Amino acid sequence: MTENPLAADLDHVLAHTAPLWEDLRGRRLFITGGTGFFGCWLLESFAWANDRLGLNAEAVVLTRDPAAFAAKHPGLSAHPAIAFHQGDVRSFAFPQGQFSHVIHGATEASAALNRDNPLAMIDTITEGTRRTLDFARQCGASRFLLTSSGAVYGTQPPDLTHTQEDYLGAPDCTLAGSAYGEGKRLAELFCTVYGEKYRLEVTVARGFAFVGPSLPLNSHFAIGNFLRDALAGDPIEIGGDGTPFRSYLYAADLAVWLWTILLRGRPGRVYNVGAEEAVSIEGVARSVAARFSPAPPVRVARVAVPGQPAARYVPSTARARTELGLEAWIGLDEALRRTIDWNQRRHD
């Protein structure tokens, strides 16, 4: 039997979540967005825990195209504890039977959709969230996790080093590009209303920036683009001036955080999900380059404007640390090493 290339990461997830899985023993979960980056890590860690702990649990995954998912993730597709339910998140027919937990992981960030069809972005987020909440009511679910985004805070002020959950910023509604952030804000409000009106125990995970196996390399994620360039032996291209700050949570830690927030988060509570160690975009690019020999050159498209404060997109994770005991256990250097190794092994 071929060893799972994510075995070390999945053991890491299990080590930090072992007591939680008893809540899912013999239960059924329903997951939307299961084919995206968050979703594949949720499913990988679910299947791993299910096998090792003998949970006899089942995850039913909503997808528009089961065949495409099977082609991309054949191991998950064939796993006996994972089933697929075909449909669009905005209008899917409700699967039969009872479900104890629902994870609404659609819709992930898509710069292309947000730019080219912001109305579709808003509709997918808002209609999909209401449809999934209605299903949670109908199927008897007791817990509901929404994966939201740090985009709900709008632009982070440059003098605010880390954004806390009670920061009341917002996207700029005069910009069509705010569709994603505003859609997620409304999705969170739907969750609040359903939680209060129907006594559904809802928790919200506001994601920031991530790195790890299965992160798209050709999307709008800068770190993914840098990895793509370096893996191809090309110069690493930075489209801007390289000064904005980000922080990166590794995918295995992300899975720990999501399961913990679903199963132990306080109902009605929002939790930032990310790392606090800020690094500039140029710093990220140079860290990626340093992982290769010879190191590819790093090209910065624009010169920074003197005296202009650097943009930031960095969360405070104090709430998750103090209430749930969560940490960013795997630092950026090790995260890059594991991500590069996984991508190289895929193409060997």
Explain the meaning of each model-derived region.
Residues M1-H101:
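N-terminal Rossmann/SDR dinucleotide-binding element
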Residues Q86-T124:
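NAD(P)H-binding glycine-rich loop region in Rossmannoid oxidoreductase-like domains
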Residues R130-G177:
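Conserved Rossmann-fold NAD(P)-dependent oxidoreductase catalytic core, especially the SDR/UDP-sugar
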Residues S149, E188-P213, G224:
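Conserved beta-loop-beta element that borders a ligand/cofactor-binding pocket
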Residues A179, G183:
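Active-site helix of classical SDR
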